[in-house]
Amino acid sequence: MKTIEIRRHSIRSKPGDHLNQQGITLARLVGENLGPFDRVITSTLPRAFETAIAMGFAVDEQIELMSTYGNDIEREAPWPLSCAGYAEVVRKGGAAARYADQLVAIYTKLANYLSDGRAALVINHGGVAEMGAVSCLPNADHFAWGSHFEPCEGIRLFWEDGKFVIGEILRVSI
């Protein structure tokens, strides 16, 4: 089985693009219990790659698609929604569903890159993380997943026999 861990970036002071000290501290604490990862991918925004680095992992690739999803998708899926809310929006089709399909393609390519028993880390953003997660596991009980992902929270996706088979929600207690 292969594992892809998708997490939202750590804490920043809005409207800034960079992590604040609290965000660096949180990412360091979370990172102490993570890994190892064969591949680390983030969005192109500083707070995403800073989170990976603060967690203790070098970034192998940055992907623009994971940086933002634009106004059309924001209208369909305004931040923040619960995981079930994002799943409902994606099921309706439209721009959010097309975007989520692109995320699934990235995660599928990443899973195919990994050897069996290995793992990868993805750091992106609120809304992006949830839409990708619900689309990787469209038949999961998204209500049980709870609310949107707070900083450094996310999901651990398990890949087996050419598909995502289960997800473990990753919550952080501060």
Regions found by a protein language model. Name each.
Residues 1-62, 88-96, 149-154, 159:
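Active-site-proximal alpha-helix that buttresses catalytic centers in soluble enzyme cores
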Residues 2-8, 41, 113-128:
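Beta-strand elements within well-structured catalytic alpha/beta cores of enzymes
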Residues 10-13, 46-47, 126-129, 136, ...:
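Short, solvent-exposed loop/turn segments at secondary-structure junctions
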Residues 13-15, 54-109:
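Phosphate-handling substructures
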Residues 25-30, 106-110, 142-143:
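A generic local structural motif
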Residues 32-36, 112-117:
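Flexible, charged surface loops at secondary-structure boundaries
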Residues 52-54, 133-136:
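Short amphipathic alpha-helical segments
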Residues 65-78, 116-118, 134-174:
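Acidic, low-complexity terminal tails and accessory targeting/binding regions
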